[in-house]
């Protein structure tokens, strides 16, 4: 992987990630395909929304179908028939999200398999091996996503262990002869001094890109913005910056304003299945009765398959009848909305008009522009 940086506007960056499997224009949003599928979508449909890279989940694909089944097909690309690049998380987030069935030790994490209850163990070395078999174009180090709230002492211990795991991840990645990209993950909760130590330690180890982890886990938005404003300038300018698990459309906008290049989140797909749809002027809850006889498109400014062909009334009908097609059409729209948002941000950065774009984005939704505390 090669990262090319074209231009900046304030702290926002316009560039691209170059892979053997294709080019990803940045800032980029990556749809989440946890089990080897972006829920309800074929790879061709995902690509048609404008997505150039997707995300897979190491932990869940390890449990089912498992490494051996994956290797029978070649790798995850061959298994799911996605031709573009794939980023896989390391399983570290499951350390956070499956907290009631796990035990963290220096060596790794002991889990109860959420499928059948069997005891299992995952460590940095195993995570690197699984991601190697998946053929991931971007491999993430194995870390602990520090929960929120966490006091300073716990956050320090967690961050320091994640640094040690980062070195073990790097060593195993290299010993496998993996020629793809490996990203480090910056931890330290909401504490700037701990984030400083984490960035410095990861840069000393050396990675192809750097993710900001441990945000969007319940902390106030002001803390997320503050940490991004503090951390991003410390990340080497020639490396991509990835904000993990984020987020709402406004979170993408605020991340880009502060120098983030990559995002992922289940929100557009999960919300679509629940009838919560993103449009230029905010949000449409298609389940509401007021849409029952509305013959207008979901978003008159959207060029997606759903908006070009179907009315709000039809989408409301499908949702009320619990039809699978409704979830699919909603997902197509939400994914396209996110990709259109990213394309708009990229164009605004190219033209040096990012703050004008941001102002219009919030004005259309009747909301104030959040303050930006950067030099």
Swiss-Prot record:
Residues binding Zn(2+), per UniProt: 302, 304, 307, 333
Positions bound to substrate: 89-93, 143, 187, 214
Cofactor annotation comment: Binds 1 zinc ion per subunit.
One function term, GO molecular function aspect: metal ion binding
Protein's GO biological process: queuosine biosynthetic process; tRNA wobble guanine modification; tRNA-guanine transglycosylation
Reactions catalysed: 7-aminomethyl-7-carbaguanine + guanosine(34) in tRNA = 7-aminomethyl-7-carbaguanosine(34) in tRNA + guanine
Cofactors demanded by this protein: Zn(2+)
Cellular-component GO terms for this entry: cytosol
Region (RNA binding) location: 245-251, 269-273
One matching Pfam family: TGT
Keywords annotated in UniProt: Glycosyltransferase, Metal-binding, Queuosine biosynthesis, Transferase, tRNA processing, Zinc
Enzyme class: transferase
Pathway membership, UniProt: tRNA modification; tRNA-queuosine biosynthesis
EC number: 2.4.2.29
Active site: 89, 264
Record's subunit section: Homodimer. Within each dimer, one monomer is responsible for RNA recognition and catalysis, while the other monomer binds to the replacement base PreQ1.
Function: Catalyzes the base-exchange of a guanine (G) residue with the queuine precursor 7-aminomethyl-7-deazaguanine (PreQ1) at position 34 (anticodon wobble position) in tRNAs with GU(N) anticodons (tRNA-Asp, -Asn, -His and -Tyr). Catalysis occurs through a double-displacement mechanism. The nucleophile active site attacks the C1' of nucleotide 34 to detach the guanine base from the RNA, forming a covalent enzyme-RNA intermediate. The proton acceptor active site deprotonates the incoming PreQ1, allowing a nucleophilic attack on the C1' of the ribose to form the product.
Similarity comment: family membership: Belongs to the queuine tRNA-ribosyltransferase family.
Protein name: Queuine tRNA-ribosyltransferase
Species for this entry: Salmonella dublin (strain CT_02021853)
Gene: tgt
């Amino acid at each position: 992987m090669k990262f090319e940086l074209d231009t900046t506007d304030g702290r926002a960056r316009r560039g691209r990630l170059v892979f053997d499997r294709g080019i990803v224009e940045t800032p980029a949003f990556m749809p989440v395909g946890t089990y080897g599928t972006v829920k309800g979508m074929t790879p061709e449909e995902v690509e048609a929304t404008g997505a150039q890279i997707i995300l897979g989940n190491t932990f869940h694909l390890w449990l089912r179908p498992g490494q051996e089944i994956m290797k029978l097909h070649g790798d995850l690309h061959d298994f799911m028939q996605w031709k573009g690049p794939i980023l896989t998380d390391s399983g570290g987030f499951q350390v956070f999200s499956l907290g009631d069935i796990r035990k963290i030790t220096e060596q790794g994490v002991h889990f109860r398999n959420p499928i059948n209850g069997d005891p299992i163990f995952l460590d940095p070395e195993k995570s690197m091996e699984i991601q190697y078999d998946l053929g991931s174009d971007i491999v993430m180090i194995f870390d602990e996503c520090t929960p929120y709230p966490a006091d300073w002492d716990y956050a320090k211990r967690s961050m320091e262990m994640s640094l040690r795991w980062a070195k073990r991840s790097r060593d195993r990645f290299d010993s496998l002869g993996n020629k793809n990209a490996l990203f480090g993950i910056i931890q330290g909760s909401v504490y700037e001094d701990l984030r400083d130590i984490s960035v410095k330690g990861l840069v000393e180890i050396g990675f192809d890109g750097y993710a900001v982890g441990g945000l969007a886990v319940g902390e106030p938005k002001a803390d997320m913005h503050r940490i991004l404003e503090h951390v991003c300038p410390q990340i080497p300018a020639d490396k991509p910056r990835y904000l993990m698990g984020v987020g709402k459309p406004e979170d993408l906008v605020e991340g880009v304003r502060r120098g983030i290049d990559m995002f992922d989140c289940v929100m557009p797909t999960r919300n679509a299945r629940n009838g919560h749809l993103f449009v230029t002027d905010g949000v449409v809850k298609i389940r509401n009765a007021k849409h029952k006889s509305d013959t207008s498109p979901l978003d008159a400014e959207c060029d997606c398959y759903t908006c070009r062909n179907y009315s709000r009334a039809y989408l409301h009908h499908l949702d009320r009848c619990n039809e699978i097609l409704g979830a699919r059409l909603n997902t197509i729209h939400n994914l396209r909305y996110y990709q259109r948002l990213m394309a708009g941000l990229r164009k605004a950065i190219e033209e040096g008009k990012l703050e004008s774009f941001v102002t219009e984005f919030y004005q259309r939704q009747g909301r104030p522009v959040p303050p930006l505390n950067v030099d």
